[in-house]
């Protein structure tokens, strides 16, 4: 409610350290929303994404996805309790501190173009950039060899993506900056 949004949908394993593959949906007012049953059929999802009709067999389209992972649901209260025990303000401060450190370090490297805004109020723990003369996937592979884990953004214009969180140390941020400096 503090965000001022009407609905929020989010995965919970990255920011909350909840079970992988679990998410939440929160809504301010559910009355005007028609319930839907999500399909686990790749053909149905792809057809929806492309604005067409699914071509899968009837059996594939009506299978609801199997048995619920109750252990994931049961773990969510503990994940929220863990995060609330640390404190939302402390989590935000630590994540912002590390992301700011990373952005400042990357911005000072001549072959890096920072895509994430440097202003702390305009970003969170994800930091994205481009490396001059290098594809993002190539940078991921070269950084992995230096013990720095990154990923590629899943968009048509992809970027190199770093993530900071409360389990990231300042030393790991500095190692990432040094590894990027050595890429070219």
Where are these regions (language model features)?
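Active-site PLP attachment segment
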Residues: 3-50
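Glycine- and other small-residue-rich loops at beta-strand/loop junctions that grip anionic moieties
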Residues: 14, 65, 165
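Structural motif of enzymes handling amino- and sulfur-group chemistry
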Residues: 48-103
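Short amphipathic alpha-helical segments
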Residues: 58-60, 123-127, 158-162
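Conserved PLP-binding catalytic core of the aspartate aminotransferase-like
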Residues: 88, 96-146
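PLP-dependent enzyme catalytic core of the Aspartate aminotransferase-like
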Residues: 137-184
């Amino acid at each position: 409610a503090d965000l001022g949004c009407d609905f929020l949908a989010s995965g919970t394993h990255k920011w909350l350290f909840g079970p992988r593959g679990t998410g939440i949906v929160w809504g301010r007012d559910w009355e005007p929303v028609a319930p839907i049953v999500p399909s686990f059929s790749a053909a149905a999802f792809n057809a929806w994404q492309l604005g067409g009709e699914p071509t899968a067999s009837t059996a594939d389209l009506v299978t609801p996805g199997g048995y619920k992972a109750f252990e994931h649901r049961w773990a969510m209260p503990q994940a929220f309790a863990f995060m609330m025990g640390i404190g939302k303000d402390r989590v935000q401060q630590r994540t912002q501190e590390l992301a700011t450190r990373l952005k400042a370090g990357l911005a000072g490297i001549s072959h890096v173009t920072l895509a994430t805004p440097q202003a702390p109020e305009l970003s969170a723990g994800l930091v994205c950039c481009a490396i001059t003369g290098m594809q993002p996937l190539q940078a991921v592979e070269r950084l992995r060899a230096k013990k720095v884990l990154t990923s590629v953004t899943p968009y048509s214009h992809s970027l190199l993506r770093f993530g900071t969180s409360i389990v990231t140390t300042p030393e790991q941020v500095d190692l990432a900056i040094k590894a990027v400096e050595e890429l070219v």
